[in-house]
Amino acid sequence: MGQEKLYIEKELSWLAFNERVLQEAADKSNPLIERMRFLGIYSNNLDEFYKVRFAELKRRIIISEEQGSNSHSRHLLGKIQSRVLKADQEFDGLYNELLLEMARNQIFLINERQLSVNQQSWLRHYFKHYLRQHITPILINRETDLVQFLKDDYTYLAVEIIRGDTINYALLEIPSDKVPRFVNLPPETPRRRKPMILLDNILRYCLDDIFKGFFDYDALNAYSMKMTRDAEYDLVHEMESSLMELMSSSLKQRLTAEPVRFVYQRDMPAALVDVLREKLTISRYDSIVPGGRYHNFKDFINFPNVGKANLVNKPLPRLRHLWFDKEKFRNGFDAIRERDVLLYYPYHTFEHVLELLRQASFDPSVLAIKINIYRVAKDSRIIDSMIHAAHNGKKVTVVVELQARFDEEANIHWAKRLTEAGVHVIFSAPGLKIHAKLFLISRKEGDDVVRYAHIGTGNFNEKTARLYTDYSLLTADARITNEVRRVFNFIENPYRPVTFDYLMVSPQNSRRLLYEMIDREIANAQQGLPSGITLKLNNLVDKGLVDRLYAASGSGVQVNLLVRGMCSLIPQLEGISDNIRAISIVDRYLEHDRVYIFENGGDKQVWLSSADWMTRNIDYRIEVATPILDPRLKQRVLDIIDILFSDTVKARFIDKELSNRYVPRGNRRKVQAQLAIYDYIKSLEQPD
């Protein structure tokens, strides 16, 4: 079999994932406003795809053409553009369908031509007092450099200023970072109707207010557009520059980086399209997409709660882990010292982790805190706790990953703020991004120093802990805490030899251990012993690991995969992957945790990890996976995995055709895994 048929291109697999998001917008069993929000998620995902994956592909094509080689990437580019165009057409149809459905529910998203006299007057007042101060037209002339001026992924109105036979052009930025994108209008009769208007259409209505008195014109016409830039940057090393200075300089490159996508309103005049293409230096490799009247649908992620309660998801209140609430424990450390604690977000509240770090910041027994941050919330209580700890005389070390994509600027800010507070801030070594989710608290207890560790699958982020599924293991088990200490030493001295007996740490031992564990399952299958591999991942694209899974399947090992995003492996290929089943689940929460399960001859090994099975995570990042040593907690993870694989509502097959076919229910009972997991965890968290 040809090698190209053994793997799905990761870019196409990623687009198939985003099409699963679009399926959620189309799913009539989802509440109406949630469906509208899924359109926003789809749009936001696609923006990131163009910034990162499409931009990388464009660079590969240019390099191959400069070298005179025949590029497979150019063929892939055509496939991508065809697939995106088809999905975008479906998106437009869905949006119009949802607008009609909203109208049936008395929610009206109207445009500037549908305003009543009363609403027109109200909007002019709104524009004058809340919006006008944020509007400054960019006039387009021979000297205008739009690549320098325009912001990445912002919506602009391109305005024709027509005077006789002369047409001039200007751009207006839609200031959705300063004013809400959705504006509630005064209701008309019948008063149960809830009219709203998009910020874009307020500007269209108020064009006269913007240009009158400055330009003579017979007519003004406005058309929407946006541009997406390449998100890559180069770290240009200078002898006297710190990593923070290099990152700050490199981020400025991103602000003026090459465009990779130009989206414009379908009825924009051809002459205006040509002017914008020329000014934005759009090349034949870039994506040029004629679209609808509105862009930046990512704002629809925050579509407001209007109308009846049944138009949004029924709330699932966060659950407390009742172990922390037992009266015998004076604080969180007492609870963790007695036994390991496993939290599973967003079903459990993230408050337990925030509270433990708050306690550590002032507890007289705490000597030191070490933590690594990758993406934190905008108003991070964790950062506040680290600053308070430093003020209280604790030895605080915060590892800040300055190269966390799209969070670089925020992390530079946090690093400066922490340093000013007296926190010891360290950064990753060049080319070795830190993606592990760790903290280590050292506490004086009698004559001993007892260490408490956190190993997680997700970021220390209060916001994403409400939306992403992730595990936190909290432990005082010295077998684990001693090795977490070694990980922090490795982070500070990445070129010193270090060994681990329990933890799986990239780039030190992850590939070797994963190969060994897969090979052991192969040997067990060949000897007739219990064998099997179950993986829950965001992405599975490392060819070495995919090939190892193919080998396991060929030896009779049953492999079950739950992959949310990219999956290069093709299940159910005859003679290659007959024993591999792969599904994906997209639902109200983003499936983010990584779990590795190996049958191990009947003595199952269960790992929780920060690492996906991508080459970068295995070989070029610091990642940590921990075994679950407590049998109770191991069973809990196994139970949750069983529920996920029993899903008959939101599970889709991953297949060669990228069909996103739903797993048929057959005669099985209806199981929506995320709701079932909530009920399962709720049943565990009952008072004694």
Swiss-Prot record:
<comment type="similarity">
    <text>Belongs to the polyphosphate kinase 1 (PPK1) family.</text>
</comment>
<dbReference type="InterPro" id="IPR024953">
    <property type="entry name" value="PP_kinase_middle"/>
</dbReference>
<feature type="active site" description="Phosphohistidine intermediate">
    <location>
        <position position="435"/>
    </location>
</feature>
<feature type="domain" description="PLD phosphodiesterase">
    <location>
        <begin position="430"/>
        <end position="464"/>
    </location>
</feature>
<keyword id="KW-0808">Transferase</keyword>
<dbReference type="InterPro" id="IPR036832">
    <property type="entry name" value="PPK_N_dom_sf"/>
</dbReference>
<feature type="binding site">
    <location>
        <position position="405"/>
    </location>
    <ligand>
        <name>Mg(2+)</name>
    </ligand>
</feature>
<keyword id="KW-0479">Metal-binding</keyword>
<keyword id="KW-0547">Nucleotide-binding</keyword>
<keyword id="KW-0460">Magnesium</keyword>
<feature type="binding site">
    <location>
        <position position="468"/>
    </location>
    <ligand>
        <name>ATP</name>
    </ligand>
</feature>
<dbReference type="InterPro" id="IPR025198">
    <property type="entry name" value="PPK_N_dom"/>
</dbReference>
<dbReference type="Pfam" id="PF13090">
    <property type="entry name" value="PP_kinase_C"/>
</dbReference>
<comment type="function">
    <text>Catalyzes the reversible transfer of the terminal phosphate of ATP to form a long-chain polyphosphate (polyP).</text>
</comment>
<dbReference type="InterPro" id="IPR041108">
    <property type="entry name" value="PP_kinase_C_1"/>
</dbReference>
<protein>
    <recommendedName>
        <fullName>Polyphosphate kinase</fullName>
        <ecNumber>2.7.4.1</ecNumber>
    </recommendedName>
</protein>
<keyword id="KW-0067">ATP-binding</keyword>
<dbReference type="GO" id="GO:0005524">
    <property type="term" value="F:ATP binding"/>
</dbReference>
<dbReference type="Pfam" id="PF17941">
    <property type="entry name" value="PP_kinase_C_1"/>
</dbReference>
<dbReference type="InterPro" id="IPR025200">
    <property type="entry name" value="PPK_C_dom2"/>
</dbReference>
<feature type="binding site">
    <location>
        <position position="45"/>
    </location>
    <ligand>
        <name>ATP</name>
    </ligand>
</feature>
<dbReference type="GO" id="GO:0006799">
    <property type="term" value="P:polyphosphate biosynthetic process"/>
</dbReference>
<dbReference type="GO" id="GO:0009358">
    <property type="term" value="C:polyphosphate kinase complex"/>
</dbReference>
<feature type="binding site">
    <location>
        <position position="375"/>
    </location>
    <ligand>
        <name>Mg(2+)</name>
    </ligand>
</feature>
<dbReference type="Pfam" id="PF02503">
    <property type="entry name" value="PP_kinase"/>
</dbReference>
<keyword id="KW-0418">Kinase</keyword>
<feature type="binding site">
    <location>
        <position position="592"/>
    </location>
    <ligand>
        <name>ATP</name>
    </ligand>
</feature>
<dbReference type="InterPro" id="IPR036830">
    <property type="entry name" value="PP_kinase_middle_dom_sf"/>
</dbReference>
<dbReference type="GO" id="GO:0016020">
    <property type="term" value="C:membrane"/>
</dbReference>
<dbReference type="GO" id="GO:0046872">
    <property type="term" value="F:metal ion binding"/>
</dbReference>
<feature type="binding site">
    <location>
        <position position="564"/>
    </location>
    <ligand>
        <name>ATP</name>
    </ligand>
</feature>
<dbReference type="Pfam" id="PF13089">
    <property type="entry name" value="PP_kinase_N"/>
</dbReference>
<dbReference type="GO" id="GO:0008976">
    <property type="term" value="F:polyphosphate kinase activity"/>
</dbReference>
<dbReference type="InterPro" id="IPR001736">
    <property type="entry name" value="PLipase_D/transphosphatidylase"/>
</dbReference>
<dbReference type="InterPro" id="IPR003414">
    <property type="entry name" value="PP_kinase"/>
</dbReference>
<keyword id="KW-0597">Phosphoprotein</keyword>
